[in-house]
């Protein structure tokens, strides 16, 4: 068997994170949300909540929308060429997204994949923007510009929660902002979009 056939696809790590996000959200339906959700007063004594908060969902619609978003993000990462560096950046952004919610102490509880998904979009958008000149960069720039516009329209500085027509829960704009920022910063730190130094690189 040739070396080419043995070579692991670079997107596998991205797919694995997507599966972990979706699988955890499904499994968490059988658990007590109070044991998993983000609560600022428990950040130091129960640090696992900066991971498990992503798996808590407040309604069936909330869960279904985020599972669909996770599937779309997995596909986006594949098209964008998100390899090991991008997956590492997204993984690092996971806990940072929720820890950053301490910046809005009025948000007394949070659960959901949306912050993590915003982080993934920021990473994938940066991957595209830092790629080869041409259409991919245009798509990356448009994706990131749309993300920034969305965050501005949500105005996270106006309060911890926002009621949106069509949703049966209130959204937390700060989670979207913290996720997007964490994803972008982690992408910078991890060198997302830079050429690998060798064939075994990320």
For each feature predicted by the language model, list its residue ranges.
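Central hydrophobic cores of alpha-helical transmembrane segments
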Residues: 21, 90-95, 138-149
